[in-house]
Amino acid sequence: MNTLDFVDQSSLRDDIPAFGPGDTVNVHVKVIEGSKERIQVFKGVVIRRQGGGIRETFTVRKESYGVGVERTFPVHSPNIDHIDVVTRGDVRRAKLYYLRELRGKKAKIKEKR
């Protein structure tokens, strides 16, 4: 094991739940405003998960007041308090970029049984 792998191994988090594309998640993010710190929840559908190790990221998409909002998070970021999996989605793709063009009921993802 070389030095970079050792540093990566020590920075990995072990409290990350198993989730993938199509799952609806609540991401509790630490937000620092001045000297105050608070937790902000970002709820949406995971449209991709890519990378590996310390560089792994995932993108969450939600509709806010009719506008699509996407946010990309590093999985092992210290700014993420925790992640809750709300529902498991039944999808056949690893990247759900096609959801960007869909609106309303067409953008619904079937729930896994």
Curated annotation (Swiss-Prot):
Gene Ontology molecular function: structural constituent of ribosome
Highest taxon listed in the record's lineage: Bacteria
Keywords for the protein's UniProt record, in alphabetical order: Ribonucleoprotein, Ribosomal protein
UniProt key word Cell inner membrane: no
SUPFAM superfamilies the record matches: Translation proteins SH3-like domain (SSF50104)
GO cellular component, one term: cytosolic large ribosomal subunit
Any Pfam family the entry gives: Ribosomal_L19
Biological process terms in GO annotation: translation
Record carries keyword Transcription regulation: no
Xref: NCBIfam families: rplS_bact
Family: Belongs to the bacterial ribosomal protein bL19 family.
Entry function: This protein is located at the 30S-50S ribosomal subunit interface and may play a role in the structure and function of the aminoacyl-tRNA binding site.
The protein's name in its UniProt record: Large ribosomal subunit protein bL19
Natural source organism: Mycobacterium sp. (strain KMS)
Gene designation per UniProt: rplS
